Amino acid sequence: MYRKKYSIHFVGIGGIGMSGIAELLLNLGYQVSGSDIKESDITQRLAKLGGTIYRGHRAENVKGCDVVVVSSAIRQENPETASAREQGIPVIPRAEMLAELMRLKYSVAIAGAHGKTTTTSIVADVLAAGGLDPTVVIGGKLLSIGSNAKLGHGEFIVAEADESDGSFLKMSPSIAVVTNIDREHMDHYKDMDEIKDAFAQFVDKIPFYGLSVLCLDSEPVQDLIPFINKRYVTYGLTTQADLQAGDVTTEGLTSRFTVRHNKKRLGRITLNLPGLHNVYNSLASIAVGLELNVPFENIKAALESLSGVHRRLETKGKVGGIVVMDDYGHHPTEIRTTLQAVNDSYPERRVGVIFQPHRYSRTQSLFEDFARSFYQADYLVVLPIYPAGEKPIPGVDSVSLCKALKAYGHKHVIHAPSKESALQELDKTVREGDVLITLGAGDVYRVGESFLASRS
């Protein structure tokens, strides 16, 4: 296939979503450059792969490139995008570049408010177990390969579809997975109906020979079904699901469940990932594998050897009888799900949480939901809001959130104005046998790492 080797520049190349696409393009032989405000493990990796990395955003960084790729976090007034437009260089969203990559192969896109990253990683492992060697682009680092992207030699590509700004509608996947729909990204969507409409458009973009894979246990996903006029399959715990998990049990960090397809028993899975949410993620992956003719024995083997995803209920270490975990969860639903999984895994231990709210807009739109999301934590330390490029909103801060948490009945809430003060509070609060988990999409994981280092 003819493919001109364009020069492609990424603004914010160190982001987890941008870097995966950049890595794939480098491996395909394209000339890739990018800028970010700080150096990181990600930018260092891309530089070693041959990328040209600039620290800071400057107009001259885009000189000579053919296209500029931006994420939704990049502001309109960014000097690089402004310079590109002045020069007539196309400026496109990340999702459009990903959609172009997906056009080259048989594509599987995983969308949903929660569980996208883990489900994408499991689908990739399932297809690999079937000998399909897929290309993978994911919003988190796969522990098995140490990266968020992999160039496969097979005819399939598996990618995470980000609904946050509606740009996932640029994709036209052959298989579209919807894990769930929730009230999220309200800075972009005006209400829940608009969110559901976006997902309805997403599943409608599959070709006539394609397939939608839908979680029947998510009520907003159920609302899509009457409007779908192409082939679809459902999964869940309910008996109405085409692919059903039954007899679910948990023991420590392990889950077990029986898989039935159209009422026929396929087998029992032992999953080395905790939580009911990972049972759902696995069901979606099984559905994709079966559609692509991966034998169930291969699917089972893949699921039972999963190594997980960085920052998804990841055990960071143990010290002095204390287990330290980390999770990316930053939405009330994710927080409740994660804490349920931790309590199921460690039913006789105290659970302590260090939470860093992510974005002022999210904290504002889901404020009361956040205030009622931590009942399964024995104690809670709340850090200042991680802005993620947003400007502060008056009255929206972690002090107000702590007051609301206490007002809703949480007995042990501590406000920590810095990571250093959070560590000081933990020294006074944590005791042997506790499970300590850092929660949030920012850099809260550093508190857990510092805690482990201070006690080693």
Swiss-Prot record:
Recorded hits in Pfam families, A to Z, give: Mur_ligase (PF01225), Mur_ligase_C (PF02875), Mur_ligase_M (PF08245)
Q: Which GO terms describe its cellular component?
A: cytoplasm
On the tree of life, the source organism's domain of life is: Bacteria
Chief location of this protein within or outside the cell: cytoplasm
Work out whether the entry's keyword set contains Nucleotide-binding: yes
UniProtKB keywords: ATP-binding, Cell cycle, Cell division, Cell shape, Cell wall biogenesis/degradation, Cytoplasm, Ligase, Nucleotide-binding, Peptidoglycan synthesis
Binding-site list for ATP = G112, A113, H114, G115, K116, T117, T118
Q: In which pathway does it act?
A: Cell wall biogenesis; peptidoglycan biosynthesis
Q: Which GO terms describe its biological process?
A: cell division; cell wall organization; peptidoglycan biosynthetic process; regulation of cell shape
- Please give the InterPro entries that the UniProt record associates with this protein: Mur-like_cat_sf (IPR036565), Mur_ligase_C (IPR004101), Mur_ligase_C_dom_sf (IPR036615), Mur_ligase_cen (IPR013221), Mur_ligase_N (IPR000713), MurCDEF_pg_biosynth (IPR050061), UDP-N-AcMur_Ala_ligase_MurC (IPR005758)
Q: Name one GO molecular function term.
A: UDP-N-acetylmuramate-L-alanine ligase activity
- Where does it live in the cell? Cytoplasm
For this protein, the Enzyme Commission number is 6.3.2.8
Q: Which family does it belong to?
A: Belongs to the MurCDEF family.
Q: Which PANTHER family match?
A: UDP-N-ACETYLMURAMATE--L-ALANINE LIGASE, UDP-N-ACETYLMURAMATE--L-ALANINE LIGASE-RELATED
What function is annotated for this protein? Cell wall formation.
- Its protein name is UDP-N-acetylmuramate--L-alanine ligase
